[in-house]
Regions:
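Conserved nucleotide-sugar phosphate-binding/catalytic loop shared by glycosyltransferases and other
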Residues: 5-7, 12, 30-85, 89, ...
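A short, glycine/small-residue-rich beta-strand->loop->alpha-helix junction that serves as a flexible
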Residues: 12-25, 48-49, 230-232
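Donor-nucleotide binding loops and adjacent catalytic segments primarily
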Residues: 28, 199-295, 347
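Short N-terminal targeting/anchoring amphipathic segment
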Residues: 94-116
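A nucleotide-sugar donor-handling region in carbohydrate enzymes
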Residues: 137-232, 258-261
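A donor-sugar binding/catalytic signature common to diverse glycosyltransferases
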Residues: 285-329
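C-terminal amphipathic helix plus adjacent low-complexity
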Residues: 352-423
Length: 423
């Protein structure tokens, strides 16, 4: 029987914002870029997953979408069905996809059991087949007290102990340890590997959004990520320009696809009064705008933080603190290391405070001024971890097809190895 190419399945948690699908897309593109014989299939309910550019060898299964309200409650995104019915459909599609696709490796992003446990049946199916199971975590999850309560409610620790073979943390322990303060057995901590942050690169051929081309001089990129909770950030920046006429740079504001139409229109009217401010709702070429920018003002989600590091940009981070402290913890840690500056909106959104920060941006340092070994080694580390898993045959019942003979993965001799956690 002929051999088949290796297959990776990625589950992308998708209930709020762009972060999860963007991270999975970056990882998928890196995997197939490192080995053209590998295929990667992403399972996601993100409404914008089809807007991203994927390399040959990557495809996605779009499951019915859900949205997470600011209150923390979930609802169906588009279907006129209750959330329980939507989750039942998602659960079956995820399991059936895993069953038919027969991956050689399953990587779950962020949520160990998926949204409301929807990945559980697929995990158990693949575990019985001996498929390696990996949980990918961002550098910061949440305040330890809140995360501990959430994981206890979701019964996460048994899954970490009994189902997953490895836990990859897409960050560095010297910046943050996501499970600090969480009671997990030593066997779980032994599974943790710190990869470094995931470097972002621009495609070889990419168009510059015309809003960026229209700028006559240096500009600040303002990005609240998906935009669903970014209105306060955009309002604060516009208030600074309205308050202070001496800000040295113009601005390109990307609202994000999930910002309400009412808020976008109100912001557009305010921005139109300034000849050096441009606005747009969404672009899948945000990296191009960031590369050309003199600096960045952002909320500091994981992916935006990786882009700031990758393009070596001066940045002012205004983290949200509700419903999670993730962005605040990341921004505080990065500021303490010297990678970025931070403004705390909970202390009041004084227009003068933002204006002062924007005026001081030209004198601010760039991330590369600080030497952090292995800071952006994430993608290389992930590929070495993936290739290691793919090199081993399934440990359980054989699949319907015979897997390829293991191939040695080409490694960069100068690359930093992933860091395995011991604490």
């Amino acid at each position: 029987m002929p051999s088949r190419s290796k297959r990776v399945l990625l589950y992308s948690h998708d209930s709020f914002g762009l972060g999860h699908v963007s991270r999975c897309r970056t990882i998928a593109n890196a995997i197939v870029g490192a080995d053209h014989s590998v295929s990667v299939l992403i399972v996601s309910g993100s409404p914008v997953v089809g807007s991203y550019e994927f390399r040959s060898g990557v495809d996605f299964v779009r499951i019915p979408g859900v949205v997470k309200q600011i209150s923390g409650e979930y609802d169906s995104a588009n279907l006129r069905t209750n959330i329980e019915h939507t989750l039942e459909m998602r659960t079956r599609i995820i399991r059936d996809t895993a069953d038919i696709y027969r991956p050689d490796l399953f990587i779950v992003d962020k949520e160990p059991l998926g949204l409301r446990g929807e990945v559980g049946p697929a995990l158990h199916l693949l575990k019985e087949r001996g498929t390696p199971l990996v949980l990918g975590l961002r550098d910061v999850m949440d305040d330890p007290t809140q995360l501990a309560k959430e994981w206890e409610r979701k019964n996460v620790v048994p899954a970490l102990r009994d189902l997953y073979d490895e836990i990859w943390v897409y960050g560095l322990p010297q910046i943050n340890k996501p499970l600090t303060g969480i009671e997990v057995p030593p066997s779980v901590r032994h599974k943790m590997v710190y990869t470094g942050y995931l470097r972002r690169e621009l495609p070889l051929h990419t168009d510059v959004p015309h809003e960026g081309e229209e700028m006559q001089g240096p500009y600040i990129l303002v990005t609240p990520g998906g935009g669903g909770d970014g209105e306060d950030l955009v309002d604060w920046v516009l208030s600074a320009y309205e308050h202070d006429g001496n800000i040295p740079y113009g601005a390109v504001i990307v609202f994000g696809p999930f910002m309400s139409a009412t808020a976008r229109e109100a912001f557009k009217e305010r921005a139109a009064k300034f000849p050096n401010i441009r606005t747009l709702t969404f672009t899948n070429n945000l990296g191009v705008l960031m590369q050309r920018a003199a600096g960045v003002v952002a909320m500091g989600g994981y992916n935006t933080f990786c882009e700031i590091l990758s393009f070596d940009k001066k940045a002012i981070i205004v983290p949200r603190t509700r419903p999670r402290l993730e962005q605040f913890i990341r921004a505080r840690a990065a500021r303490n290391v010297g990678l970025i500056e931070m403004l705390d909106a909970d202390r009041g959104r004084d227009p003068q405070a933002m204006a002062t920060a924007l005026r001081q941006l030209p004198q601010q340092g760039i991330p590369s001024d600080v030497v952090v070994p292995g800071l952006l080694d994430g993608l290389g580390s992930v590929w070495r971890l993936v290739s290691k898993q793919l090199a081993h045959p399934h440990r359980g019942p054989a699949s319907l097809e015979v897997p390829d003979a293991p191939e040695a993965a080409a490694e960069d001799p100068d690359a930093t190895s992933p860091s395995r956690a011991r604490t």
